[in-house]
Swiss-Prot record:
Its main location: cytoplasm. One of its GO terms (biological process) is cell division. Required for nucleoid occlusion (NO) phenomenon, which prevents Z-ring formation and cell division over the nucleoid. Acts as a DNA-associated cell division inhibitor that binds simultaneously chromosomal DNA and FtsZ, and disrupts the assembly of FtsZ polymers. SlmA-DNA-binding sequences (SBS) are dispersed on non-Ter regions of the chromosome, preventing FtsZ polymerization at these regions. Residues 9-70 form the HTH tetR-type domain. Belongs to the nucleoid occlusion factor SlmA family. The gene is slmA. GO terms for cellular component: bacterial nucleoid; cytoplasm. It comes from Yersinia pestis. This is Nucleoid occlusion factor SlmA. Homodimer. Interacts with FtsZ. It is found in: Cytoplasm, Nucleoid. Keywords: Cell cycle, Cell division, Coiled coil, Cytoplasm, DNA-binding. Residues 119-144 form a coiled coil.
Length: 198
């Protein structure tokens, strides 16, 4: 029984990896059908539906992976790092680095892969970025508590600016067919970002 469950889990993972790889390839710039996905995995469409009731559930699983990966690591950054600018830098690098290592998933993060899918999926991605923005805003607000001095500008405005930088780099990565890496020249960009915050 356990062996059958492992086989099923492995097949599910294989399907999700195939979908992510298709999103990374030139197929990702078009709608991915279950027929194309099944052919890529080497199974029938019926076999796909034994593991996932719909393509939407496949995207749900990938979004869940993105959420878990980013939010759990953001929580670790907040636990381990206390200095405001280091926290912000590490959170931005986390999001950009995750996207760089997972180009297919970046198409989901930018909404590009979800254009032909259910609106609910885009809503989940919107929520993810709202949660990241909320974490950035919280880090910015805590500076006043930690250092006794906050920022000149409103923390909500600054958090939006930081997130817009991230989203812009992800969009550029997808638009360039993954040629311009999100972390490219980050060390040169970081002082410019810090200057905007102060």
């Amino acid at each position: 029984m356990a062996e059958k469950e492992n086989t099923k889990r492995n097949r599910r993972e294989e399907i999700l990896q195939a979908l992510a790889q298709m999103l990374e390839s030139s197929d990702g710039s078009q709608r991915i059908t279950t027929a194309k996905l099944a052919a890529n995995v080497g199974v029938s469409e019926a076999a796909l539906y034994r593991h996932f009731p719909s393509k939407t559930r496949m995207f749900d699983s990938l979004i869940e992976f993105i959420e878990d990966s980013l939010m759990s690591r953001i929580n670790l950054i907040l636990q381990d790092e206390k200095e405001t600018f280091n926290r912000l830098r590490l959170i931005l690098l986390l999001v950009l680095g995750f996207a760089e290592r997972n180009p297919g998933l970046t198409r989901i993060m930018t909404g590009h892969a979800l254009m032909f899918e259910q609106d609910r999926l885009q809503g989940r991605i919107n929520q993810l970025f709202e949660r990241i923005e909320m974490q950035l805003r919280q880090v910015l607000r805590e500076k006043k508590l930690r250092d006794g001095q906050g920022f000149i500008h409103d923390e909500a405005l600054l958090a939006t600016q930081l997130l817009a930088f991230c989203e812009g780099m992800l969009s550029r990565f997808v638009r360039s067919e993954f040629r311009y890496c999100p972390t490219q020249e980050f060390d040169s960009r970081w002082p410019l970002i810090v200057a905007q915050l102060q």
